[in-house]
A protein has these predicted regions:
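Loop-rich catalytic cores of soluble enzymes, especially ATP-dependent carboxylate-amine ligases
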Residues: 217-223, 242-342
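ATP/Mg2+-dependent ligation/transfer catalytic cores
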Residues: 1-204, 226
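Short glycine/proline-enriched loop/turn "hinge" motifs that connect secondary-structure elements
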Residues: 100-107, 140-141, 205-209, 258, ...
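Short, contiguous, pocket-lining structural segments
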Residues: 179-187, 204-210, 222-233, 237, ...
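Accessory "access/gating" subregions that flank catalytic or transport cores
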Residues: 178-184, 188-202, 216-223, 234-250, ...
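Core alpha/beta catalytic barrel or barrel-like domain that forms the active/cofactor pocket
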Residues: 141-152, 161-178, 198-218, 248-266, ...
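Generic recognition of stable, solvent-exposed alpha-helical segments in well-folded globular domains
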Residues: 7, 124, 128, 186, ...
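Short, hydrophobic beta-strand segments
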Residues: 109-116, 214-221, 267
């Protein structure tokens, strides 16, 4: 039985029996896109596939450094969690169809979970939005693309160095280098194979401009699956590199001395029959596409909360940094905020 073909609780039980798994790893995506989770005994996990389980709601109230968010001009009654609530468990559902092999842990499958009834769960919110779109006869596909610096450092060594004078994986500026990805083909192939084994295959992988910079483009999928794959890639690529005594850094601008790093979201809309709404034989730029771009422009300020969520994000958003600083769009134009691909 293929773990990627599980559809219900009975399928999960049959699979766990077939691979003799006593424990399962479960993770939830928090509001910063970080996977938070734990090991679960198979008996508890199997019950959870049918009736859900409780998970501490603090993961939707603290930041990536486990500090509680402090929101100005917001009353306690408006906050989802905090000292005033006592940080209770909230009902969480296993996403059965998200099951994957975990290449780093034999016989311990990996599953995602979500808070379907709460408006603070990123995956739950996305599912809700996709459902509203489908009611209007629209489906969407997406793909994520990440750039990251790779260092020959460990979580301990970067702290000992006070996050300065870090050793880059490779020196100098050399985008799209065949030389470098051939010299270091073992590591590149480890990443390619990891992604293939976890069913988040890469469409492309290459060096980017900067010392030790790598760019990975994840293959297109339905938007909920694409979002899952994006989170999984960031987490498990870091696992791979740390096991190799290296660190991947996805910060927007870790140093003023080097280029910044981007995360690109590729998006498209289709009708319920799978026909593209962004291209027709009659129109080079259909109205649906133009309205889509216009909507992105209109709400760009609000989107910035998600696209540029940290102070560091704005160190990247400056002229000449290959990052958009206004709400422009263009056809095959990499200098704009929104690039229409033909």
């Amino acid at each position: 039985m293929n773990i990627r073909e599980l559809k219900n609780a009975n399928d999960v039980k049959m699979y766990l029996d077939s691979v003799n798994s006593h424990y399962v790893k479960v993770a939830i995506t928090d509001i910063d896109g970080v996977l938070r989770g734990k090991y679960m005994h198979r008996d508890k996990f199997l019950k959870a596939t049918e009736s859900g389980f409780g998970f501490c709601d603090v993961i939707f109230g603290w930041d990536s450094n486990d500090e509680l968010y402090e929101l100005r001009n917001v009353s306690e009654d408006e906050l989802f969690t905090g000292w005033h609530t006592g940080f209770p468990d909230v009902k969480t559902s296993i996403v059965v169809e998200s099951g994957r092999l975990n290449p780093f842990e034999e016989n311990i499958p990996f599953f995602l979970a979500e808070l379907s009834d709460e408006e603070v769960c990123p995956r739950g919110i996305l599912n809700k939005i996709l459902g509203l779109m489908e009611n209007e006869g629209i489906k969407s596909k997406s793909a994520f693309e990440y750039e990251f610096f790779l260092f020959d450092e460990t979580p301990h060594s970067v702290r000992e160095k006070k996050f300065s004078n870090l050793k880059n994986f490779t020196p100098g500026m050399y985008g799209y280098s065949i030389l470098r990805n051939s010299v270091h083909s073992d590591l590149y192939n480890k990443l390619l194979n990891l992604c293939a084994e976890m069913d988040l295959p890469l469409e492309g992988l290459h060096t980017e401009t900067g010392p030790g910079v790598i760019e990975a483009a994840i293959m297109v999928d339905h938007s909920i699956n694409a979002a899952d794959k994006a989170v999984l890639f960031k987490t498990f690529s870091k696992v791979l590199f740390q096991k190799n005594d290296q660190m991947a850094n996805f910060m927007a601008k870790w140093s003023d001395k080097y280029p910044g790093q981007s995360g690109h979201i590729h998006a498209s809309l289709q009708d319920l029959d799978g026909q593209s709404l962004f291209s027709t034989k009659e129109e080079a730029l259909p109205k649906t596409l133009l309205y889509f771009v216009g909507g992105l422009q209109k709400y760009m300020r609000e989107f910035a909360v998600m696209i540029a969520p940290t102070v560091n994000s704005y160190k990247r958003l400056c002229p000449g940094a290959w990052a958009p600083i206004n709400m422009t769009w263009g056809i095959e134009n990499r200098t704009t905020a929104f690039r229409v691909i033909q």
